[in-house]
Swiss-Prot record:
Membrane topology: Peripheral membrane protein
Species this chain originates from: Schizosaccharomyces pombe (strain 972 / ATCC 24843)
Pfam families listed in its UniProt record: Svf1 (PF08622), Svf1_C (PF17187)
Main location: Golgi
One of the protein's GO biological processes: ER to Golgi ceramide transport
Protein family per UniProt: Belongs to the SVF1 family.
Keyword Lyase attached: no
Protein's recorded name: Ceramide-binding protein svf1
Function: Ceramide-binding protein that may transfer ceramides from the endoplasmic reticulum membrane to the cis-Golgi network membrane, and is thereby required for the biosynthesis of complex sphingolipids.
Length: 380
């Protein structure tokens, strides 16, 4: 029991970090100030990294089906934290936006997993996520009979990263970083196929977005909070990802994003802002969750980097889709102990809302309606 407890605490808290200051993080945004941050992916960017050290690596496929009133995502999680064994997990979520009682959530650990095709594809017992020609993913999974997945995700707009390698690095010596953070995006995808949800076939054919993310280090050492936004319109897609470091790295904010139109990238953006305009206290968690939120994407065109691009959204949030207790899988007595030791109290809030946006491209101004899927994550 003592050994298990010690390893559990190590897993969730790690060792306390000294205050290194903001000089100990090298944000990817700093590397592209004054230059075009847009970079197409190279061959290595399509591969799973699978570092041997503590990490969490994920692939998430977001889908807004044409039929019905749903919002979906399929996620793969590969992790190795502290002294725990490397694990792989699949999650599937179908939000029924009109009838929340029909929402589906499955989370399943996977066995006999490996990385194939030069680490561009993931294979496990009754599950495969295969990259084909760097243009599409073929996803088949029957590891959980409540969510049988058979979809193909096609790339519609060029995938991209911020900067030459996409990495924000951590360490007092930039030439020898001890941790890193990276995101690559397929901002506009076209999904074909279905998910059998508790015996009911859900046609999930429709537009989507894909992100591949790596937290190469203990997650709560790298970030104390997260924000994510996915704005979807019939012609445009905008994405934004922001994290804030713990005080050990100066509470530094790193925000990256991009705007795509049909089959091209309009802009990769790093001078973005997020504001929780209005909040309410969640008495169950003691976090102030947003009820109205503002997003500002600010950059220049991806092709010539001469034309100003700006997109703004300021809207009340619609239905809270889900509140995820990240530590839900551990015993309640240990959860309280972990929180007391480390101050870690991670919860993810997810929302879906109809919104209005304003997009300025040089002298052209476009105002229209779209849908917003967003997440706010509090860690510590």
């Amino acid at each position: 029991m003592k050994a298990w407890l010690q390893s559990s605490i190590s897993y969730y808290t790690g060792t306390a970090e000294p205050v290194y200051g903001p000089e100990a993080i090298q944000p990817v945004t700093a590397s592209v100030q004054g230059i075009n941050p847009f970079h197409r992916l190279e061959a290595d960017d399509f591969k799973w990294s699978t570092p041997s050290s503590s990490h969490v690596e994920t692939q998430v496929f977001y889908i807004k089906p044409n039929e019905g009133d749903y919002m979906c995502f399929v996620q793969l999680i590969h992790s190795n934290l502290g002294s725990w064994t490397t694990t792989a997990q699949s999650t599937c979520r179908i939000f029924d936006l009109k009838h929340p009682e029909n929402d589906l959530w499955t989370s399943t650990n996977m066995d006999q997993f490996s990385f194939e095709n030069d680490k561009t594809s993931f294979v496990a017992k009754n599950c495969s996520v295969v990259l084909e020609d760097q243009k599409r993913y073929r996803i088949r999974a029957s590891i959980n009979m409540d969510s049988i997945i058979d979809i193909t995700v096609h790339q519609d707009a060029p995938p991209f990263k911020i900067g030459e390698d996409g990495n924000s690095t951590y360490g007092t010596d930039p030439s020898k970083p001890w941790a890193s953070m990276k995101h690559t995006f397929w901002p506009r995808t076209r999904v074909e196929g279905s998910i059998v949800a508790r015996g009911r076939v859900v046609d999930v054919t429709g537009p989507g977005m894909f992100v591949h993310a790596l937290q190469n280090g203990k997650p709560h050492h790298l970030a104390s909070s997260w924000e994510f936004a996915l704005l979807q319109h019939k012609k445009f897609t905008a994405i934004m990802m922001q994290f804030k470091t713990p005080p050990s790295y100066g509470s530094t904010i790193v925000n990256i994003g991009g705007i795509a139109m049909k089959d091209k990238i309009i802009s990769a953006t790093v001078d973005n802002t997020i504001e929780h305009v209005e909040t309410t206290l969640d008495p169950d968690t003691e976090w102030h969750e947003p009820t109205r939120i503002s997003y500002e994407w600010d950059g220049k065109d991806a092709e010539t980097y001469t034309e100003d691009i700006h997109l703004s959204v300021d809207a009340p949030l619609g239905r809270r889709l889900q509140r995820i207790d990240v530590l839900a899988e551990i015993p309640s007595w240990l959860k309280g102990f972990v929180h007391g030791v480390s101050g870690t109290k991670p919860f993810i809030y997810q929302y879906f809302s109809p919104v209005k946006f304003t997009l300025k491209m040089g002298d052209e101004v476009i105002e229209d309606e779209a849908t917003l899927f967003n997440e706010t994550t509090f860690i510590s």
